[in-house]
Regions:
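N-terminal intrinsically disordered/low-complexity leader segments
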Residues: 1-26, 218-224
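Generic hydrophobic, amphipathic alpha-helix propensity
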Residues: 26-35, 52, 77-89
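Helix-turn-helix
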Residues: 30, 38-72
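Short hydrophobic clusters on alpha-helical segments that form packing/core surfaces
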Residues: 31-39, 85, 114, 180, ...
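Alpha-helical DNA-contacting segments of helix-turn-helix folds
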Residues: 74-81, 132, 149
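Hydrophobic alpha-helical connector segments
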Residues: 76, 90-119, 173-176, 203
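Hydrophobic alpha-helical bundle segments that form small-molecule/ligand-binding pockets
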Residues: 91-100, 120-126, 131-136, 146-173, ...
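Hydrophobic/aromatic-rich alpha-helical bundle segments in the mid-to-C-terminal region
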Residues: 126, 139, 159-208, 220-224
């Protein structure tokens, strides 16, 4: 019963895969799934093409028929990640989802969800950040994704305007996302010596910072 109640709660957020063409993309997705898992765990430079193909149960030749090199693979991973992030935002940042929640409950859940996403994919987040510094395609996708997430979060904040201390909620949404994602990206690159995102206290304090910026406080049961 508790599991069912948790799944029904608006604060229970999950990563969503964007729709795929099952058969035509099966082999490609096997490579991308393997690469995403390995890069998330080990990092991009530490993951070899052989590691990826062995995990995907395919051949090195099959890899190079699809990608010129590992950088081409990273491009494909980033493209899929951005599509999945949009699909996830459509669910997680749907204002109707939060109709019966308070603003601080909503912001707390979203902040913790972002921590979970980066914690589970820290090697991938690090690779995307480094790639975006020199790859204009990755950088442009990041900008478009940021705009999309900002619009979605702004719509959620708009439905709780009376609880918040901002007039320009789109700007508030952008700064909230920058506060969270920039801190988490920094942690992904520099590791636990800078900020230990495996420590639940880090998630609590990031959530507190986001809530207070928006003029709210943490939910009373959120100091966990």
């Amino acid at each position: 019963m508790r599991t069912a109640q948790k799944l029904e709660s608006p604060t229970f957020l999950q990563w969503v895969r964007a729709p795929q063409q099952a058969r035509s993309r099966a082999a490609l997705n096997a490579l991308l799934d393997a690469a995403e898992r390995l890069v998330s765990e080990r990092g991009f430079e530490e993951t070899s093409v052989t590691d990826i193909t062995e995990t995907a149960r395919t051949s090195v030749g099959s890899f190079y028929r699809r990608f010129k090199d590992k950088r081409g693979l990273l491009q494909a991973l980033h493209e899929r990640f951005c599509a999945d992030a949009r699909a996830t935002a459509d669910v997680a940042l749907d204002p109707t989802r939060w109709a019966d929640a308070t603003a601080n409950e909503m912001v707390d859940a979203i902040a913790r969800f972002l921590v979970d996403i980066v914690r589970e994919r820290r090697g991938l987040a690090r690779a995307f950040l480094v790639s975006g510094a020199s790859d204009p395609v990755v950088r442009e996708r990041d900008v478009l994704l940021s705009d999309y997430l900002t619009d979605r979060l702004a719509a959620c904040l708009e439905s709780h305007r009376s609880e918040l201390a901002h007039d320009d909620l789109r700007l508030a949404a952008r700064i909230t996302l920058l506060l969270l994602t920039s801190t988490l990206s920094h942690a992904a690159v520099l590791g636990p010596a800078e900020l230990d995102i495996d420590d639940p206290v880090s998630a609590t304090e990031l959530s507190r910072a986001a809530c207070r910026y928006l003029g709210s406080e943490l939910p009373t049961d959120s100091n966990r």
